[in-house]
Amino acid sequence: MPADPGPEVGSGWPGLLMSCLKGPHVILKMEAMKIVHPEKFPELPAATPCFPPAPRPTPTLAPKRAWPSDTEIIVNQACGGDMPTLEGASHTPPLPRRPRKGSSELGFPRVAPVDEVIVNQYVIRPGPTASAPSSSGPVIAGEPLECPTCGHTYNVTQRRPRVLSCLHSVCEQCLQILYESCPKYKFISCPTCHRETVLFTDYGLAALAVNTSILSRLPPEALTAPSGGQWGGESEGSCYQTFRQYCGAACTCHVRNPLSACSIM
């Protein structure tokens, strides 16, 4: 009995595999390359670039001037090499340094002497006879000893002279009336030059300094407290008594030395 030949060649997966093995062989050619490092052959010359780099131009530096002169030139201040000299040129020495200013010239506040009175950034210096008042003898010309508004002589109690911003003095009684006549604006017009003094603080008339130069020239009777009431018993010619005569529009006090023009109102 003949043997079973088995499954037919070419049928199924085994046949397909066998048919692939029996096909023509494909040979792929590959070239092998060997990389050799140049460190192993130091005798070989280094490869030169095809195009050498173009040389760069060196910039020329302008010489520095040591001082304002066209003949003296310093090429390099950091190196101590030879300096170019110009024949026939005069050497101009550098300008001397200015001395430093002292503390008084730099605007530092100075210490004011004891006999000076500073009023609203002004300085009042006493006269030559301020330290020794004389009871007898002529009075040296200066600011008058009478108030320019009421005409009464200053004293050390109710009629002390107060200095305004214009450096004119007015007695305290007249200043109080001028101050109360315009409570809204708080500035006083000088009866002498008609300039205005603004009181920026709430101290009122106490913000105005007392003119000690006038007090030092007062007679002895003005240095004592007067007898009478608050205003010294002066019933006539007093600015306090003529308070009702102040006109609201012109602000004029009709006394011995009235104000011709006042810009308070």
Swiss-Prot record:
Q: Which residues form a coiled coil?
A: none
**Residues annotated with Phosphoserine modification:** S103
Q: Where is this region: Disordered?
A: 83-106
Q: Which PROSITE patterns match?
A: ZF_RING_1, ZF_RING_2
Cellular component annotations (GO), alphabetically ordered: cytosol; nucleoplasm
Q: Which InterPro entries match?
A: RING_finger_E3_ubiq-ligases, RNF208_RING-HC, Znf_RING, Znf_RING/FYVE/PHD, Znf_RING_CS
Question: Which UniProt key words apply to this protein?
Answer: Metal-binding, Phosphoprotein, Zinc, Zinc-finger
Q: Which SUPFAM superfamilies match?
A: RING/U-box
Question: From the Swiss-Prot or TrEMBL record, what is one GO molecular function term?
Answer: zinc ion binding
Zinc-finger (RING-type) residue ranges come to 147-194
Q: Which GO terms fall under biological process for this protein?
A: protein autoubiquitination
Q: What is this protein called?
A: RING finger protein 208
**Organism of origin:** Mus musculus (Mouse)
